[in-house]
């Protein structure tokens, strides 16, 4: 009989939040999902959450909808927040998203912007 449980051996998973928006490119969404979600067996130290300003279904640039999204509240617990892209460099993101990103940064989360997401 083992002296410790498997959960005692495995460290707590790090929460990674990926922010999506109406018109997100499936390719840009896939990059953080692959980096933090694939090939890390037998134990993946990351838990990926896909979040949106509006957790209703979000339509991608390819025309299909993303469902089961978390709200921006998930950013309150994430250790890493990734904005994988943005629609247009000249489009200001919603203030609610900017506030959530600032709050995550203020509490020590790592904020990552990929491609146009670096301008958010």
Can you name each region flagged by the protein language model?
Residues 113, 117:
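Gly/Ala-rich beta-loop-alpha elbow adjacent to hydrolase catalytic centers
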Residues 1-111:
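Extended, subdomain-level signal for the structured scaffold at the beginning of enzyme domains
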């Amino acid at each position: 009989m083992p002296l410790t449980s498997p959960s005692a051996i495995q460290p707590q998973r790090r929460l990674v939040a990926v922010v999506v928006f109406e018109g997100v490119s499936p390719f840009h969404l896939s990059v953080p999902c692959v980096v933090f979600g694939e090939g890390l067996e037998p134990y993946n130290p990351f838990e990926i959450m896909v979040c949106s300003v509006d957790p209703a279904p979000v339509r991608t640039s390819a025309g299909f909808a993303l469902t089961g999204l978390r709200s921006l509240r998930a950013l309150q617990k994430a250790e890493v927040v990734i904005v994988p892209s943005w629609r247009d460099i000249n489009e200001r993101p919603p203030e609610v998203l900017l506030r959530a990103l600032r709050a995550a940064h203020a509490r020590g989360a790592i904020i990552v912007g990929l491609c146009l997401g670096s301008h958010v």
